[in-house]
């Protein structure tokens, strides 16, 4: 009996000790739920919330390859072979809502590669570092093409001039600015007012742009100034801009009208005038006092879009371009284009040939 009592007592003690240890044990917390990427559909397709924030981000871009032949319709020179170019563009948009309106950013990085015909007959070209790619050779480069901040109607940063953007650029062709319509990329501070009845207005202070041969940036504290008015409706739109070049103290203006004939066919016409009859300026870069551009677009029922543009300026340059943008599959478009330029009047003395025919085929994958 004593042994039996001892065994029962030992078992009871072990059970009691085990219960006490269980009561004192540390309970591990449940793992936190993983925060997966959430889709943000407030600003269109492709946006998602940055984890831990209410900011929506979109990452997109394109890869492009161009093959050019025939004449250079900008300069009138014969390429004597194929010119090729590739570009990878990477774009980032962010948007979030604040008490002052939508706060957004946009940036675009461009990685470019150009391989032009050597222009040497029967021998390889000179690809030295000091040789201009326009004379033949290989060129690579990386550009921060856009980087700006928006808050409501306010915009500040690197963008393209309101002299282009507010009126809607030119036509949907690759060689659209053979008759030039002004500089593009610029640092700027701009404000756009958008009314609820289709009316909008813009005012911008701009630093000015540059191209291969010229620098049109300001030379002091006084910026270039651009102002514009626009009205848009279901039928189309009409817009006008006036720009003041603070370096040469001259002004230029453009007026553009777009009309939607049907939901697939549209036409547009733009006229421009400059108080300084010279292309060597930031805005009125056409030849002479005035220039005119016009074009049409037809969206075919299937996968093709047809574009046509013609332009003429006061000095006698005439440029005509047509293309077909064919979407082979969603996101991949092939665009063959043909262009013609007639260098007449005062332009004849600036080019080797009066007539230039050129062609280009563009392959572009957008994502």
Curated annotation (Swiss-Prot):
Its main location: membrane. InterPro entries: Porin_alphabac. It holds the Pfam family Porin_2. Residues 1-22 form the signal peptide. It is found in: Cell outer membrane. GO terms for biological process: monoatomic ion transport. One of its GO terms (cellular component) is pore complex. One of its GO terms (molecular function) is porin activity. It is a multi-pass membrane protein. Keywords: Cell outer membrane, Ion transport, Membrane, Porin, Signal, Transmembrane, Transmembrane beta strand, Transport. It comes from the Bacteria. Forms passive diffusion pores that allow small molecular weight hydrophilic materials across the outer membrane. The pore formed by Omp2a is larger than the one formed by Omp2b. Omp2b pores have optimal permeability to allow growth and protection against harmful compounds. The larger pore formed by Omp2a may be advantageous for intracellular growth, when the bacterium is competing with the host cell for nutrients whose concentration is particularly low within the phagosome. Monomer. Belongs to the alphaproteobacteria porin family. Consists of 16-stranded beta-barrel sheets, with large surface-exposed loops, that form a transmembrane pore at the center of each barrel. The pore is partially ocluded by a peptide loop that folds into the pore lumen. This is Porin Omp2a. It comes from Brucella melitensis biotype 1 (strain ATCC 23456 / CCUG 17765 / NCTC 10094 / 16M). The gene is omp2a.
């Amino acid at each position: 009996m004593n042994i039996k009592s001892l065994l029962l007592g030992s078992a009871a003690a072990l059970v009691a000790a085990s219960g006490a240890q269980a009561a004192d044990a540390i309970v591990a917390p449940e793992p936190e739920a993983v925060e997966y990427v959430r889709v943000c559909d407030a600003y269109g397709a492709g946006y998602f919330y940055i984890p831990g924030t209410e900011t929506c981000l979109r990452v997109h871009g394109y890869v492009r390859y161009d093959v050019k032949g025939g004449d250079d319709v900008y300069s009138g020179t014969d390429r004597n072979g194929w010119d090729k170019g590739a570009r990878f563009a990477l774009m980032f948009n962010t948007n979030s809502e604040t008490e002052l309106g939508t706060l957004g950013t946009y940036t675009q990085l461009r990685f470019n590669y150009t391989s032009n015909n050597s222009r040497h007959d029967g021998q390889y070209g000179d690809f030295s570092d000091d040789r201009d790619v326009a004379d033949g050779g290989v060129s690579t480069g990386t550009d921060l093409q856009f980087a700006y901040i928006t808050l409501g109607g306010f915009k500040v940063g690197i963008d393209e001039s309101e002299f282009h953007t507010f009126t809607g650029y030119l036509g949907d062709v690759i060689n659209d600015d053979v008759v030039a319509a002004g500089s593009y990329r610029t640092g700027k501070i701009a404000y756009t007012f958008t009314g609820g009845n289709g009316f909008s207005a813009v005012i911008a202070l701009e630093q000015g742009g540059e191209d291969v041969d010229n620098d049109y940036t300001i030379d002091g504290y006084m910026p270039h100034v651009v102002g514009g008015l626009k009205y848009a409706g279901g039928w189309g739109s009409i817009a006008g801009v006036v720009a003041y070049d603070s370096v040469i103290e001259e002004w230029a203006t453009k007026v553009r009208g777009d009309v939607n004939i049907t939901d697939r066919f549209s036409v547009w016409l733009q006229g421009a005038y400059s108080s300084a009859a010279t292309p060597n300026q930031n805005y009125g870069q056409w030849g002479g006092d005035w220039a005119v551009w016009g074009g049409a677009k037809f969206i075919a029922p299937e996968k093709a879009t047809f574009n046509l543009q013609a332009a003429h300026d006061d000095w006698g340059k005439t440029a005509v371009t047509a293309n077909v943008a064919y979407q082979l599959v969603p996101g991949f478009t092939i665009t063959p284009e043909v262009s013609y330029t007639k260098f007449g009047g005062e332009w004849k003395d600036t080019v080797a040939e009066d007539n230039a025919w050129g062609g280009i085929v563009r392959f572009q994958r957008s994502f």
